[in-house]
């Protein structure tokens, strides 16, 4: 058996082609609740995070969102706190989703931080996190890339180096070239 049509989330990158006779680029499906929140203002998103997590975030501060995908990324949890602590405190705030079972090691890495910080293992409120962010540091899985594009966020993408066939690097390249 063969498929009559191959549906893909993104067009081929790096000059790649499909062996399928007919390929249709459909785009990456995004959760309906995220689609509904895509137009949220930063002020609304920050207020939502403050209500949900008693966070004390400020809508007028530049906000960095750090997350490593559904499992977190230990490298982000080690390096980001160190790099951010060297910056001028009071001029930005951080939202960091550390990943399951990585909260305590990440909390320790931020122990001397002088900037507002909301640190959680994960959250179902990604619309609020993305809406509040001015800059995102993350992996470049397909869902993440689609969500960043939907919310129109500036991002520093660090592909997971062991992803099958380098697909996260391809995803990042696709977004960078868009």
Question: What is each stretch, according to the model?
Answer:
Residues 11, 69, 99, 140-142, ...:
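Short glycine-/small-residue-rich Rossmann-like dinucleotide-binding loops
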Residues 1, 73-79, 140, 144-147:
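Short glycine/serine/threonine-rich phosphate/pyrophosphate-binding segments
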Residues 2-3, 18-21, 90, 113-115, ...:
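Short, structured coil segments at secondary-structure junctions
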Residues 9-19, 105, 144-145, 165-172:
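Short, glycine/polar-rich helix-capping loops at beta-to-alpha or helix-loop-helix junctions
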Residues 1-43, 49-54:
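Active-site-proximal region of nucleotide-activated glycan assembly enzymes
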Residues 39-136, 169-173, 177:
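Donor-nucleotide binding loops and adjacent catalytic segments primarily
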Residues 25-26, 120, 158:
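Hydrophobic residues at beta-strand termini and immediately following loops
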Residues 126-168:
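A donor-sugar binding/catalytic signature common to diverse glycosyltransferases
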């Amino acid at each position: 058996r063969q498929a009559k049509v191959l549906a893909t989330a993104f067009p081929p990158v790096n000059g790649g082609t499909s062996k399928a006779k007919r390929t249709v680029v459909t785009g990456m499906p995004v959760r309906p609740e995220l689609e509904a929140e895509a137009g949220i203002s930063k002020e609304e998103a920050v207020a939502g995070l403050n209500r949900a997590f008693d966070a004390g975030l400020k809508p007028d501060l530049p906000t960095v969102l750090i997350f490593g995908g559904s499992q977190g990324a230990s490298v982000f949890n080690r390096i980001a706190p160190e790099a951010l602590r060297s910056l001028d405190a009071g001029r930005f705030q951080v939202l960091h989703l550390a990943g399951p079972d990585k909260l305590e090691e990440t909390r320790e890495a931020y122990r001397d931080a002088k900037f507002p910080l909301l640190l959680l293992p994960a959250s179902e409120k990604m619309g609020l996190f993305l809406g509040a962010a001015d800059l995102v540091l993350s992996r470049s899985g397909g869902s993440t890339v689609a969500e960043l594009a939907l919310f129109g966020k500036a991002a520093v993408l660090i592909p997971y180096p062991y992803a099958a066939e380098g697909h996260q690097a391809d995803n990042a390249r696709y977004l960078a070239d868009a």
